[in-house]
Amino acid sequence: MSDLIAQSRAGDNAEPLSVSALSQMLKRTVEDRFGYVRLRGELSGVKRAASGHMYCSLKDEKAVIDGVMWKGTTARLAFQPEDGLEVIATGKLTTYPGRSKYQIVLESLEMAGEGALLALLEKTRQRLEAEGLFARDRKRPLPFLPRTIGVVTSPTGAVIRDILHRLADRFPSHVLVWPVLVQGQGAAEQVSAAIRGFGAIKAGGEVPRPDLLIVARGGGSIEDLWSFNEEMVVRAIADSPIPVISAVGHETDTTLADYAADRRAPTPTAAAEIAVPVKGELAATLNDYAARQQRGVLRPLSLGRERLEARVQRLPTIETLLQPQAQKLDERVERLRGALRDRAAKGREALATQRLSPTMLQRAEREARRKLDQVRLAPALVERRAARDGERLAGLSRVLATLNPRAPLERGYALVRDADGKLVRAKGEATKQARLAVEFADGSLDVVPAGKAAAAPKRVKKSPPPGTSGAQEDLFG
């Protein structure tokens, strides 16, 4: 190219170059001279064309260079390029003949430094959180005892071995492993595809559908774990119809996948411990529950049986209940029969003293026979009559007890009488008497009012209770 320039300066008859030819010569010179380069700069003017290609500029404080990334490369990016991000770009320097400018064809982009990654991470987290992907009400409970567990991780390394070993120790389960890359280019696509692939398995098919998913990888730097901060992975976890445990990195590592998962485990081993219980402990717990349930059922029955037996022992027998009533019935029947005999005897005496016609005797005899038949053929009538008489007698006894003047004496009161046996009701009457008799429940006591000389005691005759007499009342009078 330098020879062509020298010839043109000599003014000879060299044939002039076309614009396109010169542009091609410049293009080859730039590409041959520089080849692949790595640039560090800030993204600016990021645009995606309808074709899928991405156009942008890389700049620093003093210069700007245009860049282009073709559709296939753009789809494999590990993050979403945005204006203001500081990146390290790898590509091939070339020219664009159509506009007489040079540019870099980008073949890879990576975040420049941890600070830029953290800034992008926080910005993405806020945006996805605003969409509700991390809401607590989206979290689903994990199955208590999953029969099949799907694991999304690298098929090699310590992570899968730790998970399988821990599951076997605690509660052996059927495990399906979907092998994926866990860092670098294409890792995010494989992880999200594996999560969606497990969710697409039909229940009841040849391949068992997992009841629980574990998305896991070991620890590393923020760049190593970046695939699990990618939006496609976060959305795959949030959309998964199967509950997901995220176990990415160590306990101090946090990714956006942890926010979207139904449960976060600090380590892959801890994820296995969360997924299944210890079989031996579960069996012991079940045995304890069974024993407690059996005791809870049998103890009330035993206590009820003991209380029932105690109450049965305290219950009186039928004979004990009926004996007093039968005795009372016998007594009343005998009294009734005696009264009937007395009445019949009195009737016979009256008939003997009177002159009766045969018709009257016959009628009286028929009436007596009828009553006798009633007594003989209807013992229930006798029992009812005896019951009524007993109730009447009990009522009269209560009235008699109420009217008995000695009843107050039994309660601690006393009767004061003068020498003639009359009741003294006032203090003034008592002071006029030379001697008084005080009657108690168990006897009488003679007293002298204060200031009076003692007089000869006079025996006070007790008066019978009102309403009573020396003769017994006739029950049938």
Swiss-Prot record:
Presence of the UniProt keyword Nucleus in the record: no
Cell compartments where the protein resides: Cytoplasm
Region (Disordered), start-end ranges: 452-477
UniProtKB keywords: Cytoplasm, Exonuclease, Hydrolase, Nuclease
Pfam entry (one): tRNA_anti_2
GO cellular component, one term: cytoplasm
One Gene Ontology biological process: DNA catabolic process
Catalysed reaction equations from the record: Exonucleolytic cleavage in either 5'- to 3'- or 3'- to 5'-direction to yield nucleoside 5'-phosphates
PANTHER family for this protein: EXODEOXYRIBONUCLEASE 7 LARGE SUBUNIT (PTHR30008:SF0)
Protein task: Bidirectionally degrades single-stranded DNA into large acid-insoluble oligonucleotides, which are then degraded further into small acid-soluble oligonucleotides.
The protein's assembly and partners: Heterooligomer composed of large and small subunits.
Record protein name field: Exodeoxyribonuclease 7 large subunit
Organism: Erythrobacter litoralis (strain HTCC2594)
Source taxonomy: Bacteria, Pseudomonadati, Pseudomonadota, Alphaproteobacteria, Sphingomonadales
